[in-house]
Structure formats: C-alpha cells, structure tokens
C-alpha cells in the first residue's frame, strides 16, 4: 500500500487528478481499447473533479476513450433529483468534459429488478476486462462505496441498507433532514473494488482519522471494510493532514520519506 501524506484537501484533489491524468495518458486509450475508470460521489472527490475539469480544459487530458463506472446510487430517488448520484456526476464532472454519454455507467436505483440490475452491472464491468483505476472515498466508520461495517470482503454489486450514521452524514445534502435520505442504496462490492487493477482512496478531515488508521495500521477486518486494501497489490491512500492524526509518528514519517519525490509541485 502507498500512503500519500499531503497537507490540504486542495492538494489531495490535485494529486489525485494528476495521477488519474497520468494513468490515462500513459495508457493511450482508443475506441477499441478504452481506459476504464471507477468513480465516487460525495464531498471528498469534489476537489479532484474540479482539478480534472481544469486539466481537461487546459488540453492535458481527453475522456473521449474513457469508460466510467460509478460506485453506487440511492434506491428510490428519482434520477433527476438534485441529490441523485446521476445528477451529482453530471453537475460536477461529466457535463464539463468530453466523455461520450454512452461511455458513462451508473447504477439504476429505480430498476424494476434490482438483482438483475446489479448482476448486469458486474457483467458489464467484466466485459471490459477490468477497471484500470477505481477512485473512492471512505466513511467515518471505514466504509467504502456503501459497503457498511460487516460487509463481506468478497461481496459483489448488490443492494445495501444504509446505517443511521451514514444517513446522518449524508443528510447535509438533504437540508440536514435525515428522513429525506434514502434507506437503501445499490453499491459495488468489496470484491468488485479488489478486482480493479488499482484502487485510490481519498481521505479528508479529522473525522476520517480512525478509518485511515484502521486501513494502514490495523488488521484486515470486515468491521472496517477500508482495511481490505491491505489485500490489494496496488492500493493508494491519498490523505490530508487532519486525517493522519491517529497514525503513529513513525508511520507518517516513513511514508513522508518514501513519497517525498511524488508530492512535489502541488
């Protein structure tokens, strides 16, 4: 596992965007050989999406031959609702870059057959071989996507019941009214994430410090689903300074020395 220790959320966004752009450009995608990118929603990736849009407008990257798969979607929320992840992604990213509409894949939380929707999503991912880079965030309780504590580390795309804490955390997007937050969501599984060639998780804020500690210094544990990254051959944690407050001093010093050349110029 790599840990990229930065200072601010803006630096995390810039580093993550730069890494995505470098991976896409090094891959040299074509129509017949697209780059497959996994994407999250929420507050954490906002600085990354902003930086990606700026880099696209500066001519540094094209998304014309990029296929995207989003991590999750609420169940029962209309697609046009301002807080659906469909709306979020278009508002903050897709509408500002050159990605073709047919290259965008989002789970349908209003599908008549939820199980079939989840199964087809997995099949479509497999049809491209694999996701080359999956970016994500992490919850205060260590959940990735909507894989809440005690999720199977072998799980695939499925419907999940959201914990009260997750709904409270997300209520800031729903006028701070937890009753407006859906109780269920469709989400890729932990196993789906682990199948990706590379996984990059962004960690922001002191409220995520225990989750980061569990991911880096703890044991692999289904109560902290983020710890599954210890099993991945190419995992990256990109974090700001407040999120590192629970890490041991020697752990942080080790990664600072290891990544010194990779965090320059932000």
UniProtKB/Swiss-Prot annotation:
Activity regulation summary: Allosterically activated by N-acetylglucosamine 6-phosphate (GlcNAc6P).
Pfam family, one: Glucosamine_iso
Pathway it works in: Amino-sugar metabolism; N-acetylneuraminate degradation; D-fructose 6-phosphate from N-acetylneuraminate: step 5/5
Any one GO molecular-function label of the UniProt entry: identical protein binding
EC number: 3.5.99.6
Active site per UniProt: 72 (proton acceptor), 141 (for ring-opening step), 143 (proton acceptor), 148 (for ring-opening step)
InterPro entries from the UniProt entry: Glc/Gal-6P_isomerase, Glucosamine6P_isomerase, Glucosamine6P_isomerase_CS, NagB/RpiA_transferase-like
Keyword field contains Hydrolase: yes
Family: Belongs to the glucosamine/galactosamine-6-phosphate isomerase family. NagB subfamily.
Role description: Catalyzes the reversible isomerization-deamination of glucosamine 6-phosphate (GlcN6P) to form fructose 6-phosphate (Fru6P) and ammonium ion.
Full protein name: Glucosamine-6-phosphate deaminase
């Amino acid at each position: 596992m790599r840990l990229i220790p930065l200072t601010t959320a803006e630096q995390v966004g810039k580093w993550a965007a730069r890494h995505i752009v470098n991976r896409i450009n090094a891959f040299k995608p074509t129509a017949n050989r697209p780059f497959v990118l996994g994407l999250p929603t929420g507050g954490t990736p906002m600085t990354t999406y902003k930086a990606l849009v700026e880099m696209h407008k500066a001519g540094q990257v094209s998304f014309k031959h990029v296929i995207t798969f989003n991590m999750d979607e609420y169940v029962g929320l209309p697609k046009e609702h301002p807080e659906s992840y469909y709306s979020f992604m278009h508002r903050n990213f897709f509408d500002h870059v050159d990605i073709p509409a047919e290259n965008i894949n989002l789970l349908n939380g209003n599908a008549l057959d939820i199980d079939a929707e989840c199964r087809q999503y997995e099949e479509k991912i497999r049809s491209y071989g694999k996701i080359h880079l999956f970016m994500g965030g992490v919850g205060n309780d260590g959940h990735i996507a909507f894989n809440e504590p005690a999720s199977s580390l072998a799980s695939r795309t499925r419907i999940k019941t959201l914990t009260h804490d997750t709904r409270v955390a997300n209520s800031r997007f729903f006028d701070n009214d937890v009753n407006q937050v859906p109780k269920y969501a469709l989400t890729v599984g932990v196993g789906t994430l682990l199948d990706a060639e590379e996984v990059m998780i962004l960690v922001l804020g002191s409220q995520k410090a225990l989750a980061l500690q569990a991911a880096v210094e703890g044991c692999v544990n289904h109560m902290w689903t983020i710890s599954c990254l210890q099993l991945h051959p190419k995992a990256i944690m990109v974090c700001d300074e407040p999120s590192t407050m629970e890490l041991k001093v020697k752990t942080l010093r080790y990664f600072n020395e290891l990544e010194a050349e990779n965090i320059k110029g932000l």
